[in-house]
């Protein structure tokens, strides 16, 4: 890619250098020898056939396990990406974590942008299952950040406690969190924080490093749902994303804490717009405006986000490809949540239920985190509208149950072909 940004350069066969030009001076340091790493792994594996290395997935319930046949494993197990990332590293989190009480997890992660190409034979069918039939081999993803297209984005606040829209973005040229070195992780932090310093007006704010916070300060931000949790999730730890914690991790937020950027958790960045109450339209308007400004500031400094027309924005987990967008609400549903039709209603509306505190938590006081299930194949505007329409349907069901009336399961939404 053209431009004075940090990138991996081949200095001589077998050696990779990190050229740091974005800071105004050139600094070079040896990162790794991915070719030798991959060669050593392949040589060791040749002592045993792929069938001897194939993981035991008989009790697993994740997308990876559904598609990783012995034949696919045999064809991919000796391949590596240019940075040395392997198939076994992709799938380890799904091998170690067979299933999840609330959702069917993906069970695999990417280590770099090239992962999705090198291991496409496994990733493509997983993506197709996870994203409601989206076929990355034949379809193209669309982006739309025009918040003026949103209709009726105001929820009844007797039910909806807070509204939030988030996405992720990855810096091209640097490995993703499961694979990044300490130097790459620190470079992500430097690039992002430098760009965010250019935000103005109601988006202006400051960056807070985890390493400079007290335990009490961290916990308060977590309890208030502003900060990501400590790296206790087995999905996170098994994928290698908790290494060196809390080095080069942090949170940036504006003065009102309504626009936030997480740095170096599951992704290089998570961009979040949130506020209490049910004004999803205002939350999405701020999200679109802030995200466009962040991307402009990143590009002005010679960097860019990982993106391609098949998969949209590239992130660590295949579940977040495309828009990377999760529009959600904290909503009280004491009656509907006890109805045995609730899971099927969510499924047909393409909505996902999480616990009050996120993916690895339970619901507290019948309050659920409800958000869009899909990220890929629909635009940001389409997904936010889907959530608005779906949440209003859930509220209508709750009201009907309050009045002693019956509810019905809506017909399933069909994936549009792009």
Swiss-Prot record:
* Record keywords: ATP-binding, Kinase, Membrane, Mitochondrion, Mitochondrion inner membrane, Nucleotide-binding, Phosphoprotein, Transferase, Transit peptide
Q: Where does ATP bind?
A: 162-166, 225, 270, 326, 354-359, 369
Q: In which domain of life is the source organism classified?
A: Eukaryota
Modification sites for Phosphoserine: 152, 197, 233, 366
Instruction: Give the UniProt subcellular location, in the record's own words.
Output: Mitochondrion inner membrane
What positions are modified (Phosphothreonine)?
A: 214, 356
Protein name, entry field: Creatine kinase U-type, mitochondrial
Q: Which gene encodes it?
A: Ckmt1
Species annotation: Mus musculus
- Extract one GO molecular function annotation from the record: ATP binding
């Amino acid at each position: 890619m053209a431009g004075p940004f940090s990138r991996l350069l081949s200095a001589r066969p077998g050696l990779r250098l990190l050229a740091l030009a974005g800071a105004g001076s050139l600094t070079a340091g040896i990162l790794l020898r991915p070719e030798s790493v991959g060669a050593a792994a392949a040589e060791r594996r040749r002592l045993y056939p792929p069938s001897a290395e194939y993981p035991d997935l008989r009790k697993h319930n994740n997308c990876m396990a559904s598609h990783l046949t012995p034949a696919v494993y045999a064809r991919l197990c000796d391949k590596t990406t240019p940075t040395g990332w392997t198939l076994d590293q992709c799938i380890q989190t799904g091998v170690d974590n067979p299933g999840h009480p609330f959702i069917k997890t993906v069970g695999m992660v990417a280590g770099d942008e090239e992962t999705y190409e090198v291991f496409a034979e496994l990733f493509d069918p997983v993506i197709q299952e996870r994203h409601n039939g989206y076929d990355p081999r034949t379809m193209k993803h669309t982006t739309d950040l025009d918040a003026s297209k949103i209709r009726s984005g105001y929820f009844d606040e007797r039910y909806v406690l807070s509204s939030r829209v988030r996405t992720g973005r990855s810096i091209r040229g640097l490995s993703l969190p499961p694979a990044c070195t300490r130097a790459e992780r620190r470079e992500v932090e430097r690039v992002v924080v430098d760009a965010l310093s250019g935000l103005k007006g109601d988006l202006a704010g400051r960056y807070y490093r985890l390493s400079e916070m007290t335990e009490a300060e961290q916990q308060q931000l977590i309890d208030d749902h502003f900060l990501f949790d400590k790296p206790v999730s087995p999905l996170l730890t098994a994928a290698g994303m908790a290494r060196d914690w809390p080095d080069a991790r942090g949170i940036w937020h504006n003065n009102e804490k309504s626009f936030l950027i997480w740095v170096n958790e599951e992704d290089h960045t998570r961009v979040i717009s949130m506020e209490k109450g049910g004004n999803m339209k205002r939350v999405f308007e701020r999200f679109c405006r802030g995200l466009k400004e962040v991307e402009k500031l990143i590009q002005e400094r010679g960097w860019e986000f990982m993106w391609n027309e098949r998969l949209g924005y590239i992130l660590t987990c295949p579940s977040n490809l495309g828009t990377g967008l999760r529009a959600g609400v904290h909503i009280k549903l004491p009656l509907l949540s006890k109805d045995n039709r609730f899971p099927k209603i969510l499924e047909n509306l393409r909505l996902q239920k999480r616990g009050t505190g996120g993916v690895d938590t339970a619901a507290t006081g019948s309050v659920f985190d409800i958000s869009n299930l899909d990220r890929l194949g629909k635009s940001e505007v389409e997904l936010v509208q889907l959530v608005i329409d779906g949440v209003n349907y859930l509220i209508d069901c709750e009201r009907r149950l309050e009045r002693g009336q019956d509810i019905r399961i809506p017909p399933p939404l069909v994936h549009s072909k792009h």
